[in-house]
Amino acid sequence: MGGRVFLVFLAFCVWLTLPGAETQDSRGCARWCPQDSSCVNATACRCNPGFSSFSEIITTPMETCDDINECATLSKVSCGKFSDCWNTEGSYDCVCSPGYEPVSGAKTFKNESENTCQDVDECQQNPRLCKSYGTCVNTLGSYTCQCLPGFKLKPEDPKLCTDVNECTSGQNPCHSSTHCLNNVGSYQCRCRPGWQPIPGSPNGPNNTVCEDVDECSSGQHQCDSSTVCFNTVGSYSCRCRPGWKPRHGIPNNQKDTVCEDMTFSTWTPPPGVHSQTLSRFFDKVQDLGRDYKPGLANNTIQSILQALDELLEAPGDLETLPRLQQHCVASHLLDGLEDVLRGLSKNLSNGLLNFSYPAGTELSLEVQKQVDRSVTLRQNQAVMQLDWNQAQKSGDPGPSVVGLVSIPGMGKLLAEAPLVLEPEKQMLLHETHQGLLQDGSPILLSDVISAFLSNNDTQNLSSPVTFTFSHRSVIPRQKVLCVFWEHGQNGCGHWATTGCSTIGTRDTSTICRCTHLSSFAVLMAHYDVQEEDPVLTVITYMGLSVSLLCLLLAALTFLLCKAIQNTSTSLHLQLSLCLFLAHLLFLVAIDQTGHKVLCSIIAGTLHYLYLATLTWMLLEALYLFLTARNLTVVNYSSINRFMKKLMFPVGYGVPAVTVAISAASRPHLYGTPSRCWLQPEKGFIWGFLGPVCAIFSVNLVLFLVTLWILKNRLSSLNSEVSTLRNTRMLAFKATAQLFILGCTWCLGILQVGPAARVMAYLFTIINSLQGVFIFLVYCLLSQQVREQYGKWSKGIRKLKTESEMHTLSSSAKADTSKPSTVN
C-alpha cells in the first residue's frame, strides 16, 4: 500500500514539472536555476561572477551558488600595503587601513595598482589629542603620547601623564646628607632642618651636599641659662648643668629643659633608735647639707665618709643597743649612704677618684660619659668588675657613675645578723653538708662593701657583676657563701643569697657573681662538710664487687637449671639482672661528673635500673603472698597465669613511665656536682624516694599478711615432717626477702639525726651484699639447685678425667712408636 502511494506522489510531481519544461523549451532556458546564477540552456545553469558551486555547470535544481571570499588567505587578490581587503556579496573592496587614507580620494579600490594609501598625521589633525604634560608623536598608522621629564603614562589611560615621585621611587641621586623633596615633574635635594649647604654647594639641585649646623657655637639655640647646650646631628639639646636637676615634670635633654639647683639628699636618723653617737653623726650630715654647693661635691663626699669612718671606729653607745636595733642602724646607714653618694657623684668631673680613711673605709669612683667597655674598681680588700653599659640610665644624658665603698667597721653592727637561704639552695647545701650548727651564726669573713651606679634600677642587671673579696682564712669544714644585705620592710634586714653565686674560693679569697647591686660580703656559715668516709667507700666497692659475682652466678643458675625454671625463678632472674646492671653502672660511672650531658644520661639510667629493681622486688613480694595464700586455696595455675601476664609490663613499664615523666619535666636536674644522681632541688629526688617509700610500705603489708597466713597454716598442720619443713622454709624465705629487698632501702632513708652514721654503715653493708644474699637464699639454700650443682660438678670432673686419660694415652702411643737403641 505504501509503495503505491509513493508512485502516485512521484507521478504527480512529474506532471507538475511538465508545463514548465514545455515553457523552457519554448524559450531555450531553464527556469529552475538557483539564486546568483545565470541560465546556460534549457538544462544547465552557471553561477554569476563572485559565486561558485560544486561544479561549474549546474544541471539540477538542488545545487546552490555560494559567495567567493576573495580576501581569504589563498586568494590571488592583492590590495597592497597599508590597506585591508573587505569581502562583499559576490565581490570585494580594498580599503585603507585605520590611520591611513587614499590620496586619490576614492575610498575603495580593487587591486594594488589602484592603492594610494598614506599615513594620517593624527597629531596634526588634533593637537590636543594627549592630555596635560603629554606630547603627541605620530607613528605609522597611529600615534603615541610621550610624557614630559618627571612624568609617566598612567597604565589605565595611555593619554594621561602623572607625576613621578623620584623621592620614593629611588630614582633621585640626592646626597645622604640632604632630604629629597618631590615637586610636580621634578624634585629637589634640600638640607634638613639643622643642616646647611657646605661652602660652594647649592641648596636644591641634585648635587647639593649639606653639613650639620652647630647651633651651640653659632648661638642659634634657645637653651635656658640653667642648662648647657649640646650639639647633636641635625639638632641640639639642653642639659642641666652639674649640680642642677630638671624642674619637676620637665624632662632633661630637651630644647625646652629648665633646671634648678640639686639639693643635698635627705638623710635622717632611723626612727625609734636612741643613740647620742648616732645623733652626733647625723648632725654633721645635716650641717654638710645646709652648706652644700654643687661645686664642692668632692669635699662634701670626703666629709661624709670621714664622719662615717669615725662613727664606726668608735660606735660608742651603738654597741649597747640590742642586736636587732644594731642591724636596723646598719641597714639605714647602708641605704642612705648609697643614695647620698649617688647624688653627689653626679656633680664630679670625669675621671677616677679614690678616697681612704684611718679606720679602713674606702671609696672608689669613676665618672665618665657612656663608653662601651667594662669597668674595674680596685680596693685593698675588694675588686668589682662590671659592664659600663649597666651604669647608664635609659634617657639620662648625664655622665655615668660607678662607685664602690668598702666599710669594714660595718661588721660590728652586723654581727650575728641572720642568714636567709633560698629553699633550693638550702636543699643543695644539705646534700653536701650536715646542716647549720645549732649554737652558731654565720661569721662575717670580709669587709662589707656597697656598690652603686648612676642608674638606680639595679635589681635585675642584664649582665652580672663580679666581686673578688680578700678575707681572713677559712676554718676547715665550713662553708663560704657570697651574700648581700636585703633590706626588710621593718627598716632592718638580713643576709641573703638570691641572685648571688660563689664562683670559686681559696683560703683567703672568694669570687662572687651577682645579678643585682646592693651591699655585699662573704660569710663563713657553720656547716659541717660531709667528707667522704674511706671505710664506707671500701665497704661499698668490695661489697658491690662480690655482689656482682654472686648476681652473675645466680642469673646463670636461673637460666641454665631446667629443674627449677618456673614463674618464681623468672622473677628472680629479672631482679638479678636489673640489680647487676645497676650495681655495675654505679661502680664504673657514678663519679663521671666531668661531662654534664653524659652525667645526666648516667643518672637517668641509674634512676631507671634501681626503680626497675624495686618494682621486681614488689612483684617478688606479691608472688610470695599469692604462693602463701595458695597453701589454703588451690589455685596455683591461675596464680602463674596472672603473674606471667603482669610481671613484664609492670616490671619494666612502670619504671620507664616514671623516668620519662621526670626527664620530661626537669631534665636539667639529672646529675649533681659530686655524683651522677638526682638533684634534691624542687623535690626532684622524690621521683626516686617516692617509689621507694611506696614499694617498701606495700612489701611490708604483704609480708605481714604472708606471715599471718603462714602462722595459721603452721598451727593447722599435723606432725607430717615434709609438709612442716617446706612451710618453715617458705616462712624463712619470706623473712629473708623482707630483710634483703626492703630493709636496705629503709635504712637509706633513715640516715638523719644522731644515728645517721650508724644507719649509713648498715645501709652500705647490707645493700652492697644484696647480691650475695640473693645467691645464698635462692640458689645455695635450694635443694634442687644444689643437686644440679652436684651434677655439673660431676660432669666437669668426668670431662677432666677423660681429658687426662686421653693425654696419657697419646703419650704412651708416642713412646711405643720410637725405635729401640741397641748398645
From Swiss-Prot:
<feature type="domain" description="EGF-like 3; calcium-binding">
    <location>
        <begin position="119"/>
        <end position="162"/>
    </location>
</feature>
<feature type="domain" description="EGF-like 5; calcium-binding">
    <location>
        <begin position="212"/>
        <end position="260"/>
    </location>
</feature>
<dbReference type="GO" id="GO:0007155">
    <property type="term" value="P:cell adhesion"/>
</dbReference>
<feature type="disulfide bond">
    <location>
        <begin position="216"/>
        <end position="229"/>
    </location>
</feature>
<feature type="topological domain" description="Cytoplasmic">
    <location>
        <begin position="562"/>
        <end position="569"/>
    </location>
</feature>
<protein>
    <recommendedName>
        <fullName>Adhesion G protein-coupled receptor E2</fullName>
    </recommendedName>
</protein>
<keyword id="KW-0472">Membrane</keyword>
<keyword id="KW-0068">Autocatalytic cleavage</keyword>
<feature type="domain" description="GAIN-B">
    <location>
        <begin position="354"/>
        <end position="530"/>
    </location>
</feature>
<keyword id="KW-0807">Transducer</keyword>
<feature type="glycosylation site" description="N-linked (GlcNAc...) asparagine">
    <location>
        <position position="347"/>
    </location>
</feature>
<feature type="disulfide bond">
    <location>
        <begin position="96"/>
        <end position="117"/>
    </location>
</feature>
<keyword id="KW-0297">G-protein coupled receptor</keyword>
<dbReference type="InterPro" id="IPR018097">
    <property type="entry name" value="EGF_Ca-bd_CS"/>
</dbReference>
<keyword id="KW-0966">Cell projection</keyword>
<dbReference type="GO" id="GO:0032587">
    <property type="term" value="C:ruffle membrane"/>
</dbReference>
<feature type="topological domain" description="Cytoplasmic">
    <location>
        <begin position="627"/>
        <end position="644"/>
    </location>
</feature>
<feature type="transmembrane region" description="Helical; Name=7">
    <location>
        <begin position="761"/>
        <end position="781"/>
    </location>
</feature>
<comment type="function">
    <text>Cell surface receptor that binds to the chondroitin sulfate moiety of glycosaminoglycan chains and promotes cell attachment. Promotes granulocyte chemotaxis, degranulation and adhesion. In macrophages, promotes the release of inflammatory cytokines, including IL8 and TNF. Signals probably through G-proteins. Is a regulator of mast cell degranulation.</text>
</comment>
<feature type="topological domain" description="Cytoplasmic">
    <location>
        <begin position="705"/>
        <end position="735"/>
    </location>
</feature>
<dbReference type="InterPro" id="IPR049883">
    <property type="entry name" value="NOTCH1_EGF-like"/>
</dbReference>
<feature type="transmembrane region" description="Helical; Name=3">
    <location>
        <begin position="606"/>
        <end position="626"/>
    </location>
</feature>
<dbReference type="GO" id="GO:0006954">
    <property type="term" value="P:inflammatory response"/>
</dbReference>
<feature type="disulfide bond">
    <location>
        <begin position="47"/>
        <end position="65"/>
    </location>
</feature>
<feature type="topological domain" description="Extracellular">
    <location>
        <begin position="757"/>
        <end position="760"/>
    </location>
</feature>
<feature type="disulfide bond">
    <location>
        <begin position="500"/>
        <end position="514"/>
    </location>
</feature>
<feature type="disulfide bond">
    <location>
        <begin position="71"/>
        <end position="85"/>
    </location>
</feature>
<dbReference type="GO" id="GO:0043304">
    <property type="term" value="P:regulation of mast cell degranulation"/>
</dbReference>
<feature type="disulfide bond">
    <location>
        <begin position="174"/>
        <end position="189"/>
    </location>
</feature>
<feature type="transmembrane region" description="Helical; Name=6">
    <location>
        <begin position="736"/>
        <end position="756"/>
    </location>
</feature>
<keyword id="KW-1003">Cell membrane</keyword>
<keyword id="KW-0245">EGF-like domain</keyword>
<feature type="disulfide bond">
    <location>
        <begin position="167"/>
        <end position="180"/>
    </location>
</feature>
<dbReference type="GO" id="GO:0005509">
    <property type="term" value="F:calcium ion binding"/>
</dbReference>
<feature type="glycosylation site" description="N-linked (GlcNAc...) asparagine">
    <location>
        <position position="354"/>
    </location>
</feature>
<feature type="disulfide bond">
    <location>
        <begin position="33"/>
        <end position="45"/>
    </location>
</feature>
<dbReference type="InterPro" id="IPR009030">
    <property type="entry name" value="Growth_fac_rcpt_cys_sf"/>
</dbReference>
<keyword id="KW-0812">Transmembrane</keyword>
<feature type="transmembrane region" description="Helical; Name=5">
    <location>
        <begin position="684"/>
        <end position="704"/>
    </location>
</feature>
<feature type="glycosylation site" description="N-linked (GlcNAc...) asparagine">
    <location>
        <position position="41"/>
    </location>
</feature>
<dbReference type="GO" id="GO:0071621">
    <property type="term" value="P:granulocyte chemotaxis"/>
</dbReference>
<keyword id="KW-0225">Disease variant</keyword>
